[in-house]
């Protein structure tokens, strides 16, 4: 898989090359290219934004910069039809575990990181003539820009690519993998600061352990995310 990120803060995306994601790059499972949007500006101030039509607060990122940037970045791929353009925005559809699972099968994803009041909508309308475009939100809150959302989403779907995790069963038992939250986890020692590991986990009875985990998962989901239950 190839990942491209267009941003005015390339340094923000350095964590993409660290830890598990860095190992995926080393294994050749993914490649990452980060592009500085200001490379496509033509004025001495390298301006990427302008006042919004219709008035209002803030600034809007210019199509005359974003358009050429995406033209060049998309052209660098093996074929536009295999590319997914993702726009992180609080006005987008919710990013979920199902989204992550779907994206893990993509050949190429390009992220367009907005700032200020966002990017001129015509940029995405134009791009949609050539590639698939998804505007996606990671939650009902507003960030300063799209970069943090890119880091969150990338970690969520890259870990699902076969070969990235040492144990593929790890993500199969995650929260949301079966529509429920994952229950509590424990490791050695069996007693710590007067707190004991639930005896069933020490029993060696796999059926009882599985039943206990299911019960804990249902209980936690009911308490914290009842909206996930039927």
UniProtKB/Swiss-Prot annotation:
The lineage of its organism: Bacteria, Bacillati, Actinomycetota, Actinomycetes, Mycobacteriales. It catalyses: guanosine(37) in tRNA + S-adenosyl-L-methionine = N(1)-methylguanosine(37) in tRNA + S-adenosyl-L-homocysteine + H(+). Pfam families: tRNA_m1G_MT (PF01746). InterPro entries: Alpha/beta_knot_MTases (IPR029028), tRNA_m1G_MeTrfase_C_sf (IPR023148), tRNA_m1G_MeTrfase_TrmD (IPR002649), tRNA_m1G_MTases_N (IPR029026), tRNA_MeTrfase_TRMD/TRM10 (IPR016009). Homodimer. GO terms for biological process: tRNA N1-guanine methylation. S-adenosyl-L-methionine binds at residues 114, 138-143. The keyword Protein transport does not apply. Keywords: Cytoplasm, Methyltransferase, S-adenosyl-L-methionine, Transferase, tRNA processing. It comes from the Bacteria. Its main location: cytoplasm. Its EC number is 2.1.1.228. Coiled coil: none annotated. Specifically methylates guanosine-37 in various tRNAs. It is found in: Cytoplasm. It comes from Rhodococcus jostii (strain RHA1). This is tRNA (guanine-N(1)-)-methyltransferase. The gene is trmD. It is an enzyme of class 2 (transferase). CDD domains: TrmD-like. Belongs to the RNA methyltransferase TrmD family. GO terms for molecular function: tRNA (guanine(37)-N1)-methyltransferase activity. GO terms for cellular component: cytosol.
